[in-house]
Amino acid sequence: MKPSLKRRLLLLSRKFAKASIRKLLRQSSFSSHEFLLQAPFPAMSWYRRTKLVFDSLRRNINPKILPRSHVTSRINNPIGSSNPSAKFSSISSREVGLRSWTSLGRNTNRIAYNPFLSQPKRYYYVDRYQVRHFKPRGPGRWFQNPRTVFTVVLVGSVGLITLIVGNTETIPYTKRTHFILLSKPMEKLLGETQFEQIKKTYQGKILPATHPESIRVRLIAKEVIDALQRGLSNERVWSDLGYASTESSLGGGSDKGVKEMEMAMSGEDTMTDMKWSKEDQVLDDQWIQKSRKKDSKAHAATSHLEGISWEVLVVNEPIVNAFCLPAGKIVVFTGLLNHFKSDAEVATVIGHEVGHAVARHVAEGITKNLWFAILQLVLYQFVMPDLVNTMSALFLRLPFSRKMEIEADYIGLLLLASAGYDPRVAPTVYEKLGKLGGDALGDYLSTHPSGKKRSKLLAQANVMEEALMIYREVQAGRTGVEGFL
């Protein structure tokens, strides 16, 4: 029989049976059970035949429906089922669909089970060889093992401490410690590469080694480098200062011949003698002694200065600038020489640039920029990139650059005094540089402090007092090493 016909017969038999029972109950005062027991035989036989037909139709149409509690237990505990296929899956969708179709929407106690709403978790995975693994894959749960977490933290901490301690150095004399990731050979290679690029860029504008300005700058730089050699803790004999001209070099000649050539061309010494007042002769060197004792156990890092081949290059360009690359390459533009006529003024600028090389400011700047870049990448996830770049420049990069310039001024002042030049020239030089470069941007939007601020810092009593003490030792015939150290 077709399902539709069976359904109709079932409904008709139910209605007819219910109507007959209600009619008989209304005609008698007995209960349904007593009525069935005491009813005449024809009525009982008719009821039994009707019930038999109803039960047979029901068995043929519906399978055995599980009780509510049993279905719930199979859904919640599929592993405990006697069916082997139910250990890793729930009740099949075919069986559930058949039950929902036979319920006809009349029995509200039956469960309309949806396998996609409460699918049990599968605690295994199958690899490409069809092998079942009952462990979670992936590194997502390594932190749940306390032993693994302890090992990772311990190894990471030891590695981080080793990295920090192994790359932390002490700057000569200032005793400031800084963290540098760039190795010394790489720093030297970087300086030499930049120096070769500068030669190619200004090819044809580099003054020859025999030019008066080249000889003058070379002699001033040599005095500053000699002062640096005397001031460092390791007293090594370095190679002579050479000139990096593309033409003939004076490296093979004697210093005496070079000085005689300079004196013949100039006729007189260009250094201006500055006399002291009586008040300047009375100095209190207590602050100097404290500075010597400060961090006396810390060993200053000077290995990056060993084996350096110092070279000087004078470029014929109207640029008021000079710089010293990490490999000991000094570049001076004629625009600077046109504004600063005296040797003491030129020595102030060269001493400042050499101070950058002594303190490894280029390598430190590369390391700082690396940390700044990592911080910016993190902030990009939360803040607008333009705002992050602006705030990073204002509060990180520019303050760091100004700090390096002030430190180079301080080291350069001591080198100037140790080279035999009056350190009281330095404040006027930086003030003049500020006027030439322009201090309109102020101290917050510039990589260099203003000329007035640099002049004020160098003119402070304690800083200038220390430099004057070194200068007087040199003038008295001593090397000035004790004062420098």
From Swiss-Prot:
PROSITE patterns: ZINC_PROTEASE. Keywords: Hydrolase, Membrane, Metal-binding, Metalloprotease, Mitochondrion, Mitochondrion inner membrane, Protease, Transit peptide, Transmembrane, Transmembrane helix, Zinc. Gene3D superfamilies: Metalloproteases ('zincins'), catalytic domain (3.30.2010.10). Residues 17-147 are mitochondrial matrix. Binds 1 zinc ion per subunit. GO terms for cellular component: mitochondrial inner membrane; mitochondrion. GO terms for biological process: cellular response to heat; proteolysis involved in protein catabolic process; response to osmotic stress; response to oxidative stress. The keyword Membrane applies. One of its GO terms (molecular function) is metalloendopeptidase activity. Zn(2+) binds at H352, H356, E405. It is a single-pass membrane protein. It is found in: Mitochondrion inner membrane. The keyword Nuclease does not apply. Its EC number is 3.4.24.-. Residues 456-485 are annotated as: Required for protease activation. The chain crosses the membrane at residues 148-168. Protease that is part of the quality control system in the inner membrane of mitochondria. Metalloendopeptidase that modulates the oxidative phosphorylation (OXPHOS) system and plant growth. Involved in tolerance mechanisms to heat, osmotic and oxidative stresses. Homooligomer. Belongs to the peptidase M48A family. This is Mitochondrial metalloendopeptidase OMA1. The lineage of its organism: Eukaryota, Viridiplantae, Streptophyta, Embryophyta, Tracheophyta.
